């Protein structure tokens, strides 16, 4: 039973989000780590993400039973009652929001609320089923965790937070479109209007390429804005160029789209993990803050 309650929270998604939270937190901390705050932020975000995933599982029950990848999920098979699941999801969310508010700051909590509402209320309940722009809207919720981590330390939504929001939102797009391509039949069977299904794989490839270019520009802004050092810059540039090269290889006539998309998806995880690690270890104070410190 415990295993089923864990599965419904989608542990893989929680873990992936924690990596980005750590990146945002340590970027803002600049080596001065408040460990109780760090732990509270990680636990708080984990609880909120878990809550969102459980609610998503409840909402997507009808869709999940039509998809090969999700047809054996806990709620599809009726292994946990709907009433208990809703209570479970609510308690997780309340605990997460409360922890962020008390142990971090109100801004971190409200950013978590924003991400939660977008994911559950806007994306899962409506956009995913009715609009090709669902992925775009959903990307905002996916970009919330690193911004929460950053703002838990800084207690302000500054240029650094905005750049993080851009980086992780833009990353979500090619990442999600790649999934939709190699899981094309699943999305088609469930009648989910993702771009590859609605507009075709060729159009999706064009969007993937453009979003990776935009992502590359956004990643460099952290260094150009003085938030991360040259080591991060080198890794960000290398990762972006490699990812773009992989995207461009998808235009070859002999390419197997499903194989190509899966490779692109796998590398997207490598890319965002690499950036999260590098912004953690190569953070620095923005130039204007260094100047103010010097003048004092």
Swiss-Prot record:
It catalyses: heme b + (2E,6E)-farnesyl diphosphate + H2O = Fe(II)-heme o + diphosphate. Pathway: Porphyrin-containing compound metabolism; heme O biosynthesis; heme O from protoheme: step 1/1. It is found in: Cell inner membrane. The chain crosses the membrane at residues 11-31, 35-55, 84-104, 107-127, 132-152, 162-182, 208-228, 229-249, 264-284. GO terms for molecular function: protoheme IX farnesyltransferase activity. One of its GO terms (cellular component) is plasma membrane. GO terms for biological process: heme O biosynthetic process. Its main location: membrane. Keywords: Cell inner membrane, Cell membrane, Heme biosynthesis, Membrane, Transferase, Transmembrane, Transmembrane helix. InterPro entries: Protohaem_IX_farnesylTrfase, UbiA_prenyltransferase, UbiA_prenylTrfase_CS, UbiA_sf. It is an enzyme of class 2 (transferase). Its EC number is 2.5.1.141. The keyword Membrane applies. Carbon 2 of the heme B porphyrin ring is defined according to the Fischer nomenclature. Converts heme B (protoheme IX) to heme O by substitution of the vinyl group on carbon 2 of heme B porphyrin ring with a hydroxyethyl farnesyl side group. Belongs to the UbiA prenyltransferase family. Protoheme IX farnesyltransferase subfamily. This is Protoheme IX farnesyltransferase. It comes from Pectobacterium carotovorum subsp. carotovorum (strain PC1).
